[in-house]
Design a protein with these regions (language model features):
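Conserved short histidine dyad/triad with adjacent acidic residue
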Residues: 23-28, 38-55
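Short, conserved beta-strand element in jelly-roll/cupin
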Residues: 41-44, 54-70
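Structural motif
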Residues: 67-69, 76, 92, 101
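A short, N-terminal "cap"/entry segment at the start of jelly-roll beta-barrel domains
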Residues: 1-36, 119-123
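Short histidine-centered beta-strand/loop micro-motifs
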Residues: 30-34, 49-55, 72, 96-97
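Ligand-binding loop in jelly-roll beta-barrel domains
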Residues: 89-114
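Short acidic-glycine-tyrosine-enriched beta hairpin
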Residues: 74-90
Length: 123
């Protein structure tokens, strides 16, 4: 039977980025999906960036507006509105955004967890 997710849960993070989790450990723990998939809508301000990370999950990022920059061992990708990117678990990556900020959807398989993101300490 279909399950309506009436609203996301806003997850507080530093740096001005907004995370609205629709599916995952925080918003839908009773759905039985909390460990298999997470879906969140992100809004990042101009100039936002986060530390490098080596997640143990795959991530699909769909850019809705603006530009997401993805640093990886081979260089940097620019993903703009209407484009998407897939990163694989075990890859060292860093997300940031362009001068207009960005709005995007992140789908993590298995689900995102602070314990499995492998975020590096900022220097």
């Amino acid at each position: 039977m279909p399950e309506l997710i009436a609203s996301p849960t806003r997850i507080p993070v530093p740096g001005g980025k907004v995370i609205d989790e629709h599916v995952g450990a925080v918003n839908t723990p009773e759905a039985g999906l909390q460990s298999s998939v997470s879906v969140a809508r992100m809004t990042a301000p101009a100039g936002w960036s986060e530390p490098f990370q080596t997640p143990s999950f795959d991530e699909i990022t769909v850019v809705l507006s603006g530009e997401v920059l993805l640093d990886h061992d081979g260089g940097q990708l620019s993903i703009v509105a209407g484009q998407s990117v897939i990163t694989r678990g075990g890859e060292r990556i860093r997300y940031s955004c362009g001068p207009e900020g960005a709005e995007y959807v992140a789908i993590c398989l298995p689900a995102f967890s602070p314990d499995t993101v492998g975020r590096e300490e900022e220097s």
